[in-house]
Amino acid sequence: MKKLITFIFISLFFEVPMNSQSLDLINPSNEIGIKNWTIINDDVMGGVSNSAVLINNKKNLIFKGYISLENNGGFASSRLEIRKKNLDGIRFFEIKLKGDGNNYKLRLRQKNMRASYSCDFKSQKNKWIIVKLPVEDFRPTWRGYTYSNYPRLELDKINSLGLHISDKQEGKFNLEVEYIKAVK
């Protein structure tokens, strides 16, 4: 009985959702397949940055490469199509990662939409952290511009997600991801 009262107290005062559910979007140990990732770097507009997606021996996803500012470049990204999942009611996306101190974006795309919906997060150098990105923080962006008059993100229409770096800092980058989850 004492445990039940403690749980209710914590739930009420610390807003722990009693019906919180998570849905794995990326869990590299589930054999997501490297060949399913698409790389889109600034070479599409004349830049020379490069990136790759790998799976390390711990079965974590590695997004790494080199950002070059040459030819007005400065970004690298990766994208994975996701199978139709029920994302209705999602409150936030959770990423467990170890980074290099750079800023990154989680990008969500909807079918037949030019823009993607992005949310920024900062990694910490050589330290595992969990970042939570609320759905309402995702903004429609295209080619580096944010749009205020674009339709709202519709979770049931998401068909891909990706990782993106565009902080205009030349040099190597390395992001290790254990998982990306959608949390209700």
Where does each model-flagged region fall?
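Positively charged n-region of N-terminal signal peptides that target proteins for export
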Residues: 1-4, 21
